[in-house]
Amino acid sequence: MDVRFYPAAAGDPASLDFAQCLGYYGYSKFGNNNNYMNMAEANNAFFAASEQTFHTPSLGDEEFEIPPITPPPESDPALGMPDVLLPFQALSDPLPSQGSEFTPQFPPQSLDLPSITISRNLVEQDGVLHSSGLHMDQSHTQVSQYRQDPSLIMRSIVHMTDAARSGVMPPAQLTTINQSQLSAQLGLNLGGASMPHTSPSPPASKSATPSPSSSINEEDADEANRAIGEKRAAPDSGKKPKTPKKKKKKDPNEPQKPVSAYALFFRDTQAAIKGQNPNATFGEVSKIVASMWDSLGEEQKQVYKRKTEAAKKEYLKALAAYRASLVSKAAAESAEAQTIRSVQQTLASTNLTSSLLLNTPLSQHGTVSASPQTLQQSLPRSIAPKPLTMRLPMNQIVTSVTIAANMPSNIGAPLISSMGTTMVGSAPSTQVSPSVQTQQHQMQLQQQQQQQQQQMQQMQQQQLQQHQMHQQIQQQMQQQHFQHHMQQHLQQQQQHLQQQINQQQLQQQLQQRLQLQQLQHMQHQSQPSPRQHSPVASQITSPIPAIGSPQPASQQHQSQIQSQTQTQVLSQVSIF
């Protein structure tokens, strides 16, 4: 086999690029040291290169024809294969050059290089495969010590792919490596992660298909990436934005809740306390009111409590009426919405039925549907655009056609006769083959209409019931209000009667007092005076002036007392 190579550029060997070393798939021979360049597949098994290139010192731009090199003979397995292990052990030794030395940086042996063609002349030899598989664990630790460079790795991949495409290697002796393996390995190696080295696979697994170890590596990488993504997404999902709670707007028509007895007392006394102490704060005022409330008696507290109870009763009544109005409004709105929907459904169903009734029978009659253009051209615009459909027992359609006065007579008669004949001729056909779909559709429409009517009746009944309930509630409220008003009126009348009774009692007491005063006065006047005459005469004569003299004074006093009592009674009645 002929191997063609290109000599390196003139200059020092130190300027040699690592990409050039990988680009020619061979080894350089300097000072009796043989270095083999071996490529690794997904399972990290080494192949011995069959195509080898010798890098000689720069002697110009000459080209040399080198005879093919035969592979070394198989070594005896009993000798431990020392000849095969020597080239792999020489990888760690530095390469001697002219005047200086350099150490090439090889990529790690665990790297999977895709789309790289490798010669397989020597792969099928069991001895070489066995020796390379056994020596992998020994040489792997030495080769993995070299630090990789991403730029050099990518450059070497490009050179190798170019060499494979240019046809340096024969296509019959080439195998390909899976591309997804390199993408996974490159992504992890360039990122700084070190992938675990896989064990070498047996020689039977050397084929164009990817090895199971590479698929395991891909699955591990995918699982690691998914775990990282889930860990990053976990704290983000834990923080949920708090939705602000919207406060419901109060209805102005809703009745207000009643106030407690203490609040009523506070309202009554706050103004007085503020008037006495204008500079007092709200806290001081509240303290004063609290002390006053504590000092109040039970009777005074009961007055405020009664007021609160009455306010609570009125509030409950108003709340019941308010809720009943809300229920009636909601029911009315739902009834309106349902009526609108039912009307829309009925309109849509009527449109569908009219279209079906127009289309299906006309399609059965060939004579009527055969000449629509001639009818449109011959008949004027006075003809009705839509025919009237009537449900006949024979499933016939009666079309109303209005013939204008200016219409020629030779068109109208044949038209009517043809329509009559077609209708008469189509009657038995419709009896024999009726349109089942239209009948089913009509039945469905009738059922829907019946259901809608039932729903409407139910809604009307519900509305009537709600209206009756509302009227009953209003009547109850009116009755309660009337009863409350009557009770208040009766209480006022009772109070007025009690006042009148009290006034009468006062008048009686005053009259009794007046009578007592009169009696006392009369007794005082009737006392015996000094004896100027005989006692009998004095007794007879003395009482006469005594009795007659105080009469006008007593009458005046009684009239004054009566006038005062009348004025007091009138003032009290006017107040009440």
UniProtKB/Swiss-Prot annotation:
InterPro entries: HMG_box_dom, HMG_box_dom_sf, TOX_HMG-box_domain
MF annotations from Gene Ontology: chromatin binding; chromatin DNA binding; phosphoprotein binding; protein homodimerization activity; transcription coactivator activity
Compositionally biased intervals (Polar residues): 528-542
Location relative to the cell: Nucleus
Domain of life: Eukaryota
Subunit structure: Homodimer. Interacts with CREB1; the interaction is not depolarization dependent. Interacts with CREBBP (via C-terminus). Interacts (via HGM box) with CITED1 (via C-terminus); the interaction increases estrogen-response element (ERE)-dependent transcription and protection against cell death. Interacts with CREB1 (phosphorylated form).
Stated name of the protein: TOX high mobility group box family member 3
Species lineage: Eukaryota, Metazoa, Chordata, Craniata, Vertebrata
Gene label: TOX3
